[in-house]
Amino acid sequence: MPKTVFRKGETIEETLRRFKREVSKSGVLAEARRKEHYIKPSVQKKNRQKNMRSKKR
């Protein structure tokens, strides 16, 4: 998890904006959304194969 420290003379909005940027760059939220629900390995394999087929077209 990214950590953000207040800089001297920085407003809360600027610090929050910097924190949000660091979180999006690190991919923490994307991974949390991806792991929100359990997906069986067989379903993961089907999805992977489906994506590969669509990318070949």
Curated annotation (Swiss-Prot):
InterPro entries: Ribosomal_bS21, Ribosomal_bS21_sf
Basic residues: compositionally biased ranges: 43-57
Pfam families documented for this protein: Ribosomal_S21
A single cellular component GO annotation: ribonucleoprotein complex
Keyword Ribosomal protein: yes
Gene3D superfamilies: Ribosomal protein S8
Highest taxon above the source species: Bacteria
GO biological process: translation
Single GO term (MF): structural constituent of ribosome
Similarity remark: Belongs to the bacterial ribosomal protein bS21 family.
Descriptive protein name: Small ribosomal subunit protein bS21
Organism: Aster yellows witches'-broom phytoplasma (strain AYWB)
Gene name of this polypeptide: rpsU
